[in-house]
Each structure stands twice: as structure tokens, then as C-alpha cells.
Amino acid sequence: MLLPLQLDAIQSPHMITSAKNQRIKDAQKLSRKRHREQTQTLLLEGLRLVRDAVESGVRPQTIFYAPTQLANAPDTADFLAQLDKAGIECMPCSEAVFAALANTITPQGIAAIVPLPQLALPAHPSLTLILDRVRDPGNAGTLLRSAEAAGVAQVLFAPDTVDPFNDKAMRAAMGAHFRLPLRVCAHWEELEPLLPPHAPCYLAEANAALAYDQVEWRASAVLVVGGEATGASQTAMQMATPIAIPMLGHTESLNASIAGAVILFEAARQRRRNVL
């Protein structure tokens, strides 16, 4: 069994055994939006998320790992050895220190500091998703995951919307941040120039007269999904045509992330088959 050898072979400083270590304290600060913006970095936790970032071309600045937690995780240990071989700083931590660093209830023993994703926006986006006043990070992350799967060209975060780099949003997106161009816009004046000119804009709205599957999605288009508690902003309502998902049961509306996914995959269906 080569696993213990692989872990021992990683060239790294002495194990961090105190949560007061400055490197740990600096990493913990990345749970705050302000610090993420100041450093232009974020903390990823778990093998799936770190691997997705690396496979998307991201080079981690630092890896933190708990050797005892990886003793029965050969895939993680192999991946860690590859990162070390590539010259990436790998810092071992005690289980207690890693638990203090982690944001999950059951940490997987690996975390990484990486640059904030900044993929270039497309010059001529085919389908744009706008998140408007979506404040739940789980919904935002799930919408990003669905958008990437449905072939959305770009995602724009309107004012008064959750930070897409919130740790819960990152986990819910399952790596979509590293494959999908997105921008956070503090003002609508920043957002509007990023939209394709003359493209129709639609707003998911429970009581709209127009059904989502009666819309022409094959050409360039924009979809706005508003928050569940407060709905979309006045700006979005003025610029977009409302569309609804007809309900057959007694449920009045769907969760924002589910509604967004239903509409996005209708757009994907039309584009894939080139039919309305």
C-alpha cells in the first residue's frame, strides 16, 4: 500500500497544529466577501471542488490537508501528490486545525486557496441568465450548476443579489464557477452593456400569461430569475416580458432554482433540436 508513502513524500513545512497559525487565520478570513474581494482569492473545500478547479485550469496558491483524514482516501492522496509534484504548496494540518478551517460539518481533509474565477465574457452571448435579488446561496449555486449544464453563455449577478463566491453557493454550483463566465454588477448601469443588443428579455413570473415553452429560445435571449422572498427588482420588471411555468397541481409557484432550471432546459431543448 503506497498511500502512507505518498503522504509522507509530500514536500511541505512542519504540520500546523494551532488554529492561531497566521496561514490558517488568513485562510479563515476568506469566508468573508470583503476579504475575498481584497485578495481576489477564495477557499475551496473538498476533493470534488478542488479537482474541478484544477481540471478547469486553475492553479491553487496553497493546499491545506489533514493527513489522518486522508489515510483511507487514496484518490485524494493521489491527487495531493500530483499537486505537490507540480510545485504547489501543500501544508499539512492536524485534524483539529483543519476542522477550524473548514466550513462543512464533515470535512474531507483537503482545501485550497485559489484565484477568484474570472472567465472572459463572450462577445456575442447566445443565452444570458440574470440573477436578480436571489439571496439564498444554495439557490444561486444550483442556478449556476443548471446554467452551465444547459449551455448558458454567461451569468450576470444584478445588484442586491447574493455573492456567487459564498461557500454555500460554491458547493451548490459543483464547479460551475470555473467553467461558466459570470460577473457581479453593483449597478444595473454596469449590467446592461453586457447584454446582447436587441435580444428579448424574459422574467420568470408565477402569474404571467405567456408560457415559458411558447417563447422562441433559439435566437439570442436573456432570462431573469428573481428572488423567492422579494421577487425581481423594478428595473428587471420594466425591461423583461414575464413568462410562467403552467402548474397542473395546486402548488402556486416553484423554488427559484427549479423554475430557472426548467426554463433553461426548455431553451436547451429548442436549441438542440432547432425546434420550438
Indicate residue ranges for each PLM-predicted region.
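RNA substrate-binding interface of SAM-dependent RNA methyltransferases
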Residues: 10, 55, 91, 96, ...
